[in-house]
């Protein structure tokens, strides 16, 4: 019992430490660089303290619940602040803190010339805090607060360079697409309020209501918006307009992971609902294939990595769809390490090449930037699921489990194709950015000797190598794993990965010196992201916006300012003038007619 009592105490201590730098900004004006180091140190201490309850949980396997502040009671709906410290939250929190610590240290180098770097660090810290609120929440209200918190912080961080039109547009896209998902989340909250009169997870899961398809569809819509699934995905590659540390934090352990994590939280309701499982599986399979196709022909290094994130999120949705939430969570944790490392490495290249992001203008960087090149190679191999790197311990079991789900053959097939494409575009990054001859200006000064650049990448390299083994060794399977399977199924994940590597290498070598005369339709489809942004952001809104503009500026003005008043007055005046102008104004003729009439009348009277 003493061990269990230590878990909530230490975890709350780490959360309180994170809030201290925010409180200092309210008490005094932090114009010096001390705030940066205070914030980084606070995250480091919080990470060190959070490791203790995680290790205690691994030893005792006892969950802890904290309910320490009652807010209000509305009729019989009790609203309180409560935390759920179980396997998911206690495992994810140290990982998020470790990655944020590395990203903040990297930001000291990457953002050193920004005049508002103190505010930038505060936003990063708030981004982390809202994600930890979401992860540790034990009720829907607290979960919704964290949900909206990561949304607003992503808006502020994506639009950090608000002088750029593209950055503002990308932030608005992220906000609007997430508002669509929030409609589903609010619908789910309303359904549970009406039918269960409770937002506490324990009561919802113990009640286990029937016919939960409607609220779970709302949850799936919310997760699709937050985790950039097909249909609500265009904001994710656009979000690359933000600073690289923002992209690293957003893609590794905060914003996009919130949707998948929420689905994992609600798996007790989903595991017996075949409609939701099938919908999740199909949505994830379509997403992972579509975004992998789009990543194959992109030239922006950050967009390639961003689309790979969306593809991996689709793979996590596939895993949830085949009723393996623990596997999806393990992949979420392992993915965080190498994805953060890939973004930091790309930021190192971009910063050293004077903001050049086109991989066609790189090359030969393995000589001038060996540490960054090593990180990109290890991260790309881990992303593809190369054996004994971090990604292997989650990706290989996912493919094995999917192979055993024989009723979902088409979803398995396109998932395998997407896994092979992952190896292809990862090889393409290595081939164009690191190998060959330099294609950047010869006077470019390349330097990676700064410890704020090198140390975070080194830490993430170690995480990308060893953390998959450590996490998988301390995870209890949700269901009984398949004990036997044919050898060709066992090696399927490795086979499709090697196939992708081989095809990408051969194609790159064959086409390196060829002129690209005219792109094919498939190439254009991939480069234009499946024409989805063009269709949804231009073709469909254009008629309605044009009609609205004409209605507001032309038709309304034409009616009120032209037809109703001036033309009506003109018509009235013309009518009156026509009535008056029947008399021609011939006075002599009128007077003569008058005299003749009087004379004739007098003669007749006499």
Swiss-Prot record:
Naturally occurring in which organism (per UniProt): Loxodonta africana (African elephant)
Enzyme class: translocase
Protein purpose: Core subunit of the mitochondrial membrane respiratory chain NADH dehydrogenase (Complex I) which catalyzes electron transfer from NADH through the respiratory chain, using ubiquinone as an electron acceptor. Essential for the catalytic activity and assembly of complex I.
Membrane topology field: Multi-pass membrane protein
InterPro entries associated with the record: NADH_DH_su5_C, NADHpl_OxRdtase_5_subgr, ND/Mrp_TM, NU5C-like, Proton_antipo_N
One GO cellular component term noted in the UniProt record for this chain: respiratory chain complex I
Protein name (Swiss-Prot/TrEMBL): NADH-ubiquinone oxidoreductase chain 5
Claim: Translocase is one of the keywords in the record: yes
Gene: MT-ND5
Upper taxonomic lineage: Eukaryota, Metazoa, Chordata, Craniata, Vertebrata
